[in-house]
């Protein structure tokens, strides 16, 4: 049985790919690319494609639906684990590419136990998480001194839930803010953070955009590839 590398390719800028990730991609026999539905394409692949122009690796797309139906998802993860293991028979080297870092809301980690069940050797290669890149771009410190940091998704939460998180933590990163913009707006206002947030969308790409104005945010359609950093207003 071959070996699979789970590779974080960073948030969007191809130049933020790590040297180790680059070297593994050069030697990979197969590169596995997650996509939300068949034929939709892979943003992770768009990040690496210029780095593998001379590669002879086989590119395999794997479908990962963007919903939360547990049983259906588990079947898909198991099937993708089987597909990956089949491709790596005969001591082949594979690379499963994923946005940001594999340990942060990554399709790879959901699939990992199902790949291991087939006896495939696995190594995880870290990448730059989107919220770290966003903090750098916006020059926003994520933590200082004894402050804490919470990273949490927005998933059709009630405004009360989000407000509670903002009141309990010094620094908050909300992933997937497009999931419930209205609840997010309410929570920002109720926690008094209208002047201490930054929305960063499509970080590291040509479409990158930063929004720090609450009124502008109210009128803006937040795309899926976005995140928000919120600081304590007293800081």
What is each of the regions a protein language model found here?
Residues 1-14, 19-21, 26-121, 210-212, ...:
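Class I S-adenosyl-L-methionine
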Residues 4, 166-235:
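A contiguous loop/helix-start segment that scaffolds small-molecule binding in enzyme catalytic cores
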Residues 33, 61, 96-98, 124-127, ...:
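General beta-strand structural signal in soluble alpha/beta enzymes
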Residues 38-41, 129-132, 181-182, 205-207:
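Short gly/pro/ser/thr-enriched loop/turn and capping motifs at secondary-structure boundaries
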Residues 65-70, 131, 157-159, 205-207:
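A short acidic, often aromatic-flanked loop/helix-cap motif at beta-alpha or helix-coil junctions
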Residues 77-86, 142-153, 216-227:
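A polyampholytic, Gly/Pro-enriched intrinsically disordered region
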Residues 78-81, 156-159, 181:
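Structural motif corresponding to alpha-helix initiation and N-cap regions
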Residues 103-168, 233-234:
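Class I SAM-dependent methyltransferase SAM-binding "motif I" and its flanking Rossmann-like core
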């Amino acid at each position: 049985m071959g070996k699979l590398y789970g590779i974080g390719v960073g948030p969007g800028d191809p130049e933020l790919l790590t040297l180790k990730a680059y070297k593994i991609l050069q030697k990979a026999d197969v590169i596995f690319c997650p996509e939300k539905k068949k034929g939709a394409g892979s943003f992770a692949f768009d990040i690496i494609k210029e780095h593998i122009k001379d590669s002879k690796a086989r590119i395999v797309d794997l479908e990962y639906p963007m919903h939360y139906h547990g049983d259906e998802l588990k079947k898909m993860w198991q099937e993708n684990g089987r597909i990956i293991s089949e491709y790596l028979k005969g001591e082949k080297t594979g690379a499963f590419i994923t946005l940001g870092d594999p340990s942060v809301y990554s399709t790879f980690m959901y699939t990992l136990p199902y790949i291991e069940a087939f006896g495939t050797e696995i190594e995880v290669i870290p990448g730059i998480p989107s919220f770290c890149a966003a903090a750098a771009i916006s020059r926003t410190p994520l933590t200082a001194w004894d402050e804490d940091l919470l990273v949490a998704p927005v998933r059709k939460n009630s405004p009360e839930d989000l407000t509670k998180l903002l009141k309990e933590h010094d620094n908050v990163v909300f992933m997937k803010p497009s999931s419930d913009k209205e609840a997010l707006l309410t929570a920002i206002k109720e926690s008094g953070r209208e002047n201490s947030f930054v929305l960063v969308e499509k970080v590291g790409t040509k479409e990158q955009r930063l929004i720090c104005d609450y009124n502008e945010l109210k009128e803006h359609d937040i795309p899926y590839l976005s995140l928000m950093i919120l600081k304590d207003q007293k800081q």
